Amino acid sequence: MSRVKRGNVAKKRRAKVFKLAKGFKGAHNSLFRTAKQQVLKALRYSYVGRKRKKRDFRRLWITRINAAAHSQGMNYSTFITALKKDNIALNRKMLAQLASNDIKAFQAILETVKN
């Protein structure tokens, strides 16, 4: 059986890691072992971040809706309860966009919910 030299495979493997480590500081983008560790850590952080982003945006929307509802004399929980009771199917993202961009439409929704 003939000898197999792994030069090309090893170079490709390292190049793949260094490509992902581009922009990292210090030895983290130039030494293979540390670059590989940092890439794995960065991939873990990005995975967790994609999950966290959903929670963070939901919190932001709730905060915006609460602030807009408070300015009209109603709190968030009673507003959402009244929306559900009146079968108004607007999600929190839409409500937050209305609260920040189209205040008159948000006030109209509040008035229909109050009555």
Curated annotation (Swiss-Prot):
GO terms for cellular component: chloroplast; ribonucleoprotein complex; ribosome. The keyword Nucleus does not apply. Its main location: plastid. GO terms for molecular function: rRNA binding; structural constituent of ribosome. It is found in: Plastid, Chloroplast. The keyword 4Fe-4S does not apply. InterPro entries: Ribosomal_bL20, RIBOSOMAL_L20_CS, Ribosomal_protein_bL20_C. GO terms for biological process: ribosomal large subunit assembly; translation. It holds the Pfam family Ribosomal_L20. Keywords: Chloroplast, Plastid, Ribonucleoprotein, Ribosomal protein, RNA-binding, rRNA-binding. HAMAP family: Ribosomal_bL20. Binds directly to 23S ribosomal RNA and is necessary for the in vitro assembly process of the 50S ribosomal subunit. It is not involved in the protein synthesizing functions of that subunit. Belongs to the bacterial ribosomal protein bL20 family. This is Large ribosomal subunit protein bL20c. It comes from Porphyra purpurea.
